C-alpha cells in the first residue's frame, strides 16, 4: 500500500494534535494527584468515553476483528456477555467502595481492605500484566505500519512508543483521558464506513450470511456457526470457538469479564478520576451504551474479511498466511482498509487504527506508572518522600514502562490471534483477583491471610492448568502443555476460559478456607470497605437516567434483546 500525500497529512495532523494536548496540559501537572488521577476533576461523560476508549486498543480493534474472522458472530459474547453485565455491576455496586475509600489505585484498596502483602502481590502481578497488554498494542501497531506502509517492524514499534511516551510524560492521566475521547470519535469515524462498504460489496447482511454459510460448511460446522451467537453453543465441537454455553457464561461472562471490568485498574482509574461519587458510578454505565454497539463496528469487519477471503468474488482479496501455515486473522482490518478505502479515506482509516493502538498503550502505561509509584515504589522502596519526588518518579516509571512494553511486543508475535494471548493474561491475573474482591467486598469475614493465600493459589492453579492442557493444533510451549498434555481443548479460547474458571474456583475456595481459621479485622475498620457495613448513596430526587441502578437496568435490558436478536 502507498498512502498519498493527503493520507500522510491526515496522520501527521493527528500526531501533532495528540502531542499538542500533552504540551497544553503540562502546566497543570503540579502534584502527583494531578498527574496520576487528574485531580479527580473529570466530567462523567468525558470519563465514560475515556473508560471505553482505554479498552479500545489492539485487543478491541485488531483482536476482535481477528476473532470475528476466526469465530464469527459468537465473538459478540465478549460484549453482550463478557462486558456489559460486569460494567453495570461495577457502576452500581463497586464504585462506591473504590471512590468512597479515596484509594488511589486498586492495589491500595486491597491494602485498606486486607493487608500490605495482598496489595504488594496484586501490584506486582498487575504491573506485569499491563506491560504485556501495552506490548500487544505496540505489536499490532508495528504490524500495521509494516504491512501498510512498508516500515521496518522494529522502527514501527519504537516510533509508536516514542509518541505515546511524549504525551503521557507531559500531561499524565489528563492528557491520556482527553486523547482517549478524541480517539473514540476517530475510531467510530474511521471504521463505520469500512463496515458499510464491506457489507455493500457482499450484498448486505444477507449476502454476508450466505458467504458465512459457505465458510461454516467448508469447515464441517452447521450453516449458522459463523452468523449466530447462541444457537451452536450446545456442544464445544459444534462451533468454531470450541466452547459450550457453560464455558461462555461462567468462564467469560462471570470470571473473566467481572475480573477485568471490576478489578483492572486500567479502566477503574478512569472512573476514579471523575469529579464526584455520582459521576464515578455513572462512568461505566455511560460507557456501556456505545460498548453494546461495538460488535457491529469491530467484529463484523472480521466476518466480512473471512467471508471474502474464503469465497472470493466481488471482493477479490484474501487473508495472508503466517509462516506456520495458519491464517493471519490479525490482518483482517488492515487488509480491508487496503482494499476498500481510497486515498483520503485511507488516511482516516489508518489514523483510526493508530488511535486505537495508542489508546491501548496509553491506558496501560498510565495505569502502570500509578501502581508502580504508589503501590511499589512509595510502599516498599522510598517512603516519606515529597509529593514532587513521586511526581518525578511517575514520569520515570512512564519511560521504563514503555521500554518494557516494547519487549513484550515481540512476545505477542507468537500468537496468531492476539485476543487469545490477552485472555490468557486475564485468566492468570484478573480471574483469581475477582474472587478476592468478591469476598472482600461482600463477606466481612474474609481476612488478609486468606486473600493472599487465595491469590497465590489461584495464579498457581492457572499455571498448572495451562501446563497440563493444550489447544488442538498448538505446539507445546507458551500455549500450554509444559508438563504434560492431559486434556486437549478444541481451541485456545476454550482453554483460556477453563484456565480462568480453575483460577477463580481455587482462589475462592482457598480464601474462604484460610479466612475461617484466621482472625478477621474488627467491623469498625471495615466501614466503607464492605457492602453490609457501608451506607448506601442517596439517589432521591434524581431522574432515572442519573440513577445508576435504573440506568444499569435499562442497559441490561437492551443487551438481553441484542442476544435474542442474533441468537
Language model features by range: what are they?
Residues 1-567:
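Membrane-embedded helix-loop-helix hairpins and adjacent transmembrane boundary segments
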Amino acid at each position: 500500500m502507498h498512502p498519498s500525500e493527503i493520507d500522510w497529512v491526515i496522520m501527521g495532523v493527528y500526531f501533532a494534535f495528540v502531542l499538542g494536548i500533552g504540551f497544553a496540559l503540562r502546566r497543570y501537572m503540579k502534584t502527583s494527584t494531578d498527574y496520576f488521577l487528574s485531580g479527580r476533576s473529570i466530567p462523567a461523560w468525558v470519563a465514560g468515553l475515556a473508560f471505553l476508549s482505554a479498552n479500545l486498543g489492539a485487543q478491541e480493534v485488531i483482536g476482535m476483528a481477528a476473532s470475528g474472522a476466526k469465530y464469527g458472530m459468537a465473538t459478540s459474547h465478549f460484549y453482550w456477555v463478557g462486558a456489559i453485565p460486569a460494567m453495570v455491576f461495577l457502576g452500581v455496586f463497586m464504585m462506591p467502595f473504590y471512590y468512597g475509600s479515596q484509594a488511589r489505585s486498586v492495589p491500595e484498596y486491597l491494602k485498606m481492605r486486607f493487608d500490605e502483602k495482598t496489595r504488594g502481590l496484586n501490584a506486582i502481578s498487575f504491573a506485569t500484566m499491563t506491560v504485556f497488554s501495552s506490548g500487544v498494542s505496540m505489536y499490532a501497531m508495528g504490524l500495521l505500519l509494516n504491512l501498510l506502509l512498508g516500515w521496518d517492524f522494529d522502527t514501527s514499534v519504537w516510533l509508536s512508543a516514542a509518541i505515546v511516551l511524549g504525551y503521557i510524560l507531559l500531561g499524565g492521566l489528563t492528557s491520556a483521558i482527553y486523547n482517549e475521547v478524541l480517539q473514540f470519535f476517530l475510531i467510530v469515524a474511521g471504521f463505520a464506513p469500512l463496515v458499510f462498504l464491506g457489507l455493500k460489496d457482499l450484498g448486505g447482511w444477507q449476502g454476508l450470511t450466505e458467504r458465512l454459510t459457505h465458510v461454516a460448511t467448508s469447515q464441517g460446522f452447521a450453516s449458522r456457526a459463523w452468523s449466530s451467537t447462541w444457537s451452536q453453543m450446545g456442544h464445544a465441537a459444534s462451533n468454531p470457538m470450541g466452547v459450550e454455553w457453560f464455558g461462555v457464561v461462567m468462564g467469560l461472562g462471570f470470571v473473566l469479564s467481572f475480573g477485568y471490568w471490576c478489578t483492572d485498574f486500567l479502566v477503574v482509574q478512569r472512573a476514579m478520576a471523575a469529579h464526584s461519587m455520582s459521576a464515578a458510578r455513572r462512568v461505566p454505565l455511560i460507557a456501556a451504551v456505545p460498548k453494546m454497539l461495538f460488535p457491529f463496528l469491530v467484529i463484523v469487519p472480521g466476518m466480512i474479511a473471512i467471508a471474502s477471503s474464503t469465497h472470493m468474488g466481488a471482493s477479490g482479496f484474501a487473508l495472508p498466511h503466517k509462516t506456520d501455515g495458519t491464517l493471519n486473522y490479525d490482518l483482517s482490518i488492515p487488509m480491508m482498509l487496503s482494499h476498500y478505502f481510497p486515498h483520503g479515506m485511507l488516511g482516516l482509516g489508518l489514523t483510526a487504527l493508530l488511535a486505537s493502538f495508542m489508546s491501548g498503550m496509553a491506558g496501560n502505561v498510565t495505569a502502570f506508572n500509578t501502581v508502580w509509584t504508589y503501590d511499589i515504589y512509595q510502599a516498599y522502596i522510598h517512603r516519606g518522600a515529597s509529593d514532587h519526588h513521586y511526581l518525578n518518579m511517575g514520569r520515570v516509571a512512564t519511560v521504563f514502562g514503555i521500554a518494557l512494553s516494547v519487549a513484550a511486543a515481540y512476545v505477542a508475535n507468537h500468537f496468531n490471534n492476539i485476543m487469545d494471548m490477552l485472555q490468557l493474561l486475564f485468566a492468570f491475573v484478573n480471574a483469581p483477583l475477582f474472587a478476592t474482591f468478591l469476598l472482600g467486598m461482600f463477606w466481612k469475614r474474609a481476612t488478609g491471610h486468606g486473600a493472599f493465600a487465595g491469590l497465590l493459589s489461584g495464579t498457581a492453579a492457572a499455571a498448572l492448568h495451562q501446563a497440563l492442557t493444550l489447544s488442538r493444533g498448538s505446539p507445546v510451549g507458551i500455549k500450554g502443555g509444559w508438563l504434560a498434555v492431559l486434556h486437549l481443548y478444541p481451541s485456545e479460547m476454550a482453554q483460556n476460559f477453563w484456565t480462568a474458571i480453575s483460577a477463580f474456583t481455587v482462589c475462592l475456595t482457598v480464601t474462604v478456607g484460610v479466612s475461617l481459621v484466621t482472625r478477621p479485622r474488627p467491623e469498625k475498620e471495615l466501614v466503607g470497605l464492605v457492602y453490609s457495613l457501608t451506607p448506601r448513596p442517596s439517589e432521591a430526587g434524581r431522574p432515572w437516567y442519573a440513577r445508576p441502578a435504573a440506568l444499569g437496568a435499562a442497559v441490561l435490558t437492551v443487551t438481553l434483546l441484542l442476544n435474542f436478536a442474533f441468537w
